[in-house]
Amino acid sequence: ALGIAQQIQQPVAVICSSGWALLNYYPAIAEAFYSNIPLVVLSADRPVYRIDIGDGQTIRQDHVFDRHLVYSAPLQQDVIHHTDAILQSNQQQLIPVPFQPEQLAEMQQAVQTYNASEIHQALSAAIEHQKPVHINIPMEEPLYNTIDKPTVALPVFSQNSKKKTVSFPSKAFSSLWNRASKKMILVGCL
């Protein structure tokens, strides 16, 4: 993914499950950061109440790469998926107590609005700065149901060419180059 993003100069997504798997991306994220490569890291995560209780391979994923990102988007957990489990362990306080079922749609809409904004900001930052971003997605199990279309409208970005050109006086450079007794050429990323 890093090589593809480098070649096409557009964001490329990498996706992983939660826990230790996410940490395996750190070398690529650091390289993308210092090489100006727009990498989008999408990670699944456990619900907040499952973190720091010894649940297998569960780590604090929010902002784990912040020193090498231009944007970190910790999304909010859906409240309509597996509501009974959320209510049973309402440590993350996603649903207010006492709970009124008619509030659920309004609460979910607020989550959707927040998540859509975070996704948009992350993708915009990756494109604008040509650097990596991280979108962390908490999910409640079970994850058996599927959907036919996304519930968040993804933004459409216009293609802006940000190719940088460097110009120098070619005659002056050629003259200087030809007079030099020793020459060194350094090649690297700009």
Task: State where each predicted segment sits.
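Short acidic, glycine/serine/threonine-rich loops at helix termini
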Residues: 2, 25-27, 51-55, 84-88, ...
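Short coil/turn connectors at secondary-structure junctions
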Residues: 8-12, 34-39, 68-70, 129-132, ...
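Short beta-strand segments
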Residues: 15-17, 38-45, 76, 134-138, ...
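Glycine-rich, acidic loop regions that bind phosphate or pyrophosphate groups
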Residues: 32, 43-122
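Conformationally flexible catalytic loops at phosphate/diphosphate-handling active centers
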Residues: 90-109, 113-121, 125-180
